[in-house]
Each structure stands twice: as C-alpha cells, then as structure tokens.
C-alpha cells in the first residue's frame, strides 16, 4: 500500500491518487468535547509540506464517500484503504469513549451512508497513544446492536502510531476488544525531517511473521528518499506512508523489486498476513 500522507483537503484526494497512491492518511481534529470537527494536522509536521490545510469534517467525509463508492461519478477505484490519524490528544481523556461513539456514528451515517454499497474503502483507526484505547472500544461497541456490524467486521482495522512498546500494544488492543491478528496494523516512523532506523520495523515484521504474533500488517512513515524506500521494502513492510507516492511507484519498477512487490488492489485483503 502506498499511503499518501496528510491528505486533508478534498482536492488532495485525487492529487495523491494521480501520483500513484492507493491509500490515504487523513488527520481528524476534534473539539474540546471529543467530537470530530475538521481535517487538520497542524505544526510541526513534515519538511516541504504545508501543515494547515483543512476541511469541515462533514464536507471531507462526503467527498471521501463519493470517491470510494462504485457508480458515483467521482469514484476512484485506486483508493482502497483510508487511515484516519485521530488527533485525540486535544480533549480530556474522560471523553475518549464518547468520542469513539461519535466517530462511529460519523462513519456509519456520513461515510457508509447507512448502506452496504457506499464508502467501500477499508479503514484503519490510528490512535496516537495506547491509553486512548477506549476510543477503539467505543467505536466497536457502537456496532454491537447495529445492523452494520458486518461492515465493522469486514472493513475496519486498528493501529497505534506512537512508537510505544509492542508487547503492551498487544495487551491494550485486547483490552479494547481487539483479538490478536484482528485487523491489526502496526506503524513505525517519524517525520521525514529526521532519519529513523528500521530496528523497530524489523521487530514488528518479526512479530507479524511469528506463529504467535498479533500483527497483520506493518507500515513505515513518513519517507520519500529513494534509499529509504528501498530499505523499507527490503525489510518486508506492507505499506509505506509518503508525501511523494510517485517515488514509491518508481522504486517498485526497479529490477530488485518488480517481481517481489505489486500495488495492492481492492481485492487484496488488508487484514490478512501475506505469506511468501
């Protein structure tokens, strides 16, 4: 998966897809009560990027639904996966559960449109800290009595992006109601302004490939240097988050990689661990 980073304006959806992305990351900002309010990253972010682009949340989700609904004039078949980078650090932790419920309602009614046929992209809920796990718990429990529980079970995955201890990550996911390998993505990375070793990525890949692991997919963020992309692919990641998707597509065409990797399509399940 080529994961376009910081896609927070509606026009950026097509911009990143046209550059070769098949996935996008969207930053979700909340009000002080924990209700999703708009798309926004803010500073600091990445080198050579504007960090303050924003849309009202309802407008962006409406456009995202259109881009991922077959038959819609704005449908883009390339867009198979959306990572919601949930900026949950801006409100009191006591509101985490209610915030998760509110975001579940937004996805059900504004993205899925209360239908099995709209908003087909797979979703990863990405939280910045392990102690925000009640957001995931609430999101899942919203669908316990819903006729759309099948969409939760088919289309939603989970990630913690704060580079915290992976053994503890497993425990916290279980506390949130997520079983081992139940749609678990594990990210590792840092802003593109700083070089980061692949040690933690390799540890995550080892857990993913272990018979007793809890991870389905591993991704690295945020890179666009050709050498860094090659190193990440050689570490056997499943996804790369980037500001320059065309760099990833160029590397995938190189002799060393063209027979080892290909772009994921909608028919590639992001919850299944790939076995070579």
UniProtKB/Swiss-Prot annotation:
GO terms for biological process: killing of cells of another organism; lipid catabolic process. Keywords: Cytolysis, Dermonecrotic toxin, Disulfide bond, Hemolysis, Lipid degradation, Lipid metabolism, Lyase, Magnesium, Metal-binding, Secreted, Toxin. Transmembrane segments: none annotated. Belongs to the arthropod phospholipase D family. Class II subfamily. GO terms for molecular function: lyase activity; metal ion binding; phosphoric diester hydrolase activity; toxin activity. Binds 1 Mg(2+) ion per subunit. Dermonecrotic toxins cleave the phosphodiester linkage between the phosphate and headgroup of certain phospholipids (sphingolipid and lysolipid substrates), forming an alcohol (often choline) and a cyclic phosphate. This toxin acts on sphingomyelin (SM). It may also act on ceramide phosphoethanolamine (CPE), lysophosphatidylcholine (LPC) and lysophosphatidylethanolamine (LPE), but not on lysophosphatidylserine (LPS), and lysophosphatidylglycerol (LPG). It acts by transphosphatidylation, releasing exclusively cyclic phosphate products as second products. This is Dermonecrotic toxin LlSicTox-alphaIV2iv. Its cofactor is Mg(2+). It is found in: Secreted. Its EC number is 4.6.1.-. Its main location: secreted. It comes from the Eukaryota. Disulfide bonds join 45-51, 47-193. The keyword Transmembrane helix does not apply. Mg(2+) binds at residues 25, 27, 85. One of its GO terms (cellular component) is extracellular region. The active site is at residues 5, 41. It is an enzyme of class 4 (lyase). It catalyses: an N-(acyl)-sphingosylphosphocholine = an N-(acyl)-sphingosyl-1,3-cyclic phosphate + choline; an N-(acyl)-sphingosylphosphoethanolamine = an N-(acyl)-sphingosyl-1,3-cyclic phosphate + ethanolamine; a 1-acyl-sn-glycero-3-phosphocholine = a 1-acyl-sn-glycero-2,3-cyclic phosphate + choline; a 1-acyl-sn-glycero-3-phosphoethanolamine = a 1-acyl-sn-glycero-2,3-cyclic phosphate + ethanolamine. It comes from Loxosceles laeta (South American recluse spider).
């Amino acid at each position: 998966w080529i994961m376009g980073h910081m896609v927070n304006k509606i026009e950026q959806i097509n911009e990143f897809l046209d550059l070769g992305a098949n996935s996008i990351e969207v930053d979700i900002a909340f009000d002080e009560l924990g209700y999703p309010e708009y798309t926004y990253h803010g500073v600091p972010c990445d080198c050579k990027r504007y960090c303050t682009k924003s849309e009202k949340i309802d407008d962006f989700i409406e456009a995202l639904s259109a881009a991922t609904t077959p038959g819609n004039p704005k449908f883009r078949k390339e867009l198979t996966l959306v990572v919601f980078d949930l900026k949950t650090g801006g409100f009191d932790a006591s509101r985490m559960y209610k915030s998760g419920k509110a975001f579940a309602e937004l996805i059900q009614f504004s993205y899925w449109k209360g239908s099995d046929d709209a908003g087909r992209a797979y979703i990863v809920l990405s939280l910045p800290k392990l102690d925000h796990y009640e957001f995931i718990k609430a999101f899942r429990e919203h669908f316990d009595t819903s006729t759309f529980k099948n969409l939760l079970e088919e289309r939603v995955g989970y990630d913690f992006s704060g580079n915290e201890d992976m053994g503890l990550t497993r425990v916290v996911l279980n506390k949130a109601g997520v079983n081992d390998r139940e749609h678990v993505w594990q990210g590792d990375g840092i802003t593109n302004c700083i070089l980061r070793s692949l040690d933690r990525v390799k540890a995550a890949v080892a857990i993913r490939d272990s018979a007793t692991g809890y991870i389905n997919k591993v991704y690295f963020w945020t890179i666009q240097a050709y050498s860094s992309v090659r190193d990440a692919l050689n570490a056997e990641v499943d996804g790369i988050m980037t500001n320059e998707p065309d760099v990833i597509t160029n590397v995938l065409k190189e002799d060393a990689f063209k027979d080892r990797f290909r772009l994921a399509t909608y028919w590639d399940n992001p919850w299944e661990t790939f076995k070579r």
